[in-house]
């Protein structure tokens, strides 16, 4: 049986568990200042080809989403999500508490489509309404559906055409 409740409800891959077990009993300073975090940060810098990048780690999804969204949006901008999408119902109001609106659209599949985005954009056409700027998806969705590559490409295309971030 598959469960799409959240990523915290499932056990880690056996290789991850083995690596964690190898660290049992060792002490770390935490807050991203220990040797392991520094090592991983260096690996990330190498992977992205940015040796001077400033890498920080977050310990949960809500704080990650809140930090990212609050830093990429201006006060008059909003996030587009499906009704029942993760950011709509599982962030305990964190996004709204930052002053940003989550604009929701109905989707029986749990997925956003370019048509959904076009509809939201047409409903927010000028400076007198909140301006959509982030398109937020979860893959898999809250109901277990998974975006196909073609669907993701189509979302990327409409976001690029309209100056939206796909997150």
Predicted regions and their residues:
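Conserved N-terminal alpha-helix of the aminotransferase class I/II PLP-enzyme fold
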Residues: 13-60, 83-88, 94
């Amino acid at each position: 049986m598959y469960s799409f409740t959240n990523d915290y409800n499932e056990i880690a891959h056996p290789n991850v568990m083995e690596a964690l077990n190898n660290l049992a009993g060792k002490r770390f300073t935490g807050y991203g200042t220990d040797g392991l975090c520094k090592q991983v940060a260096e690996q990330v810098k190498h992977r992205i080809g940015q040796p001077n990048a400033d890498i920080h780690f977050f310990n949960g999804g809500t704080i990650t989403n809140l930090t990212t969204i609050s830093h990429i949006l201006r006060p008059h901008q909003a996030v587009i999500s499906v009704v029942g999408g993760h950011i709509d119902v599982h962030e305990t109001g964190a996004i709204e508490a930052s002053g940003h609106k989550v604009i929701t659209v109905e989707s029986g599949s749990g997925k956003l489509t370019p048509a959904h985005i076009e509809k939201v954009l047409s409903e927010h056409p000028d400076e007198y309404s909140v301006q959509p700027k982030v398109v937020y998806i979860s893959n898999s969705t809250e109901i277990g559906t998974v975006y196909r590559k073609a669907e993701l490409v189509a979302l990327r295309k409409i976001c690029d055409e309209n100056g939206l971030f796909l997150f």
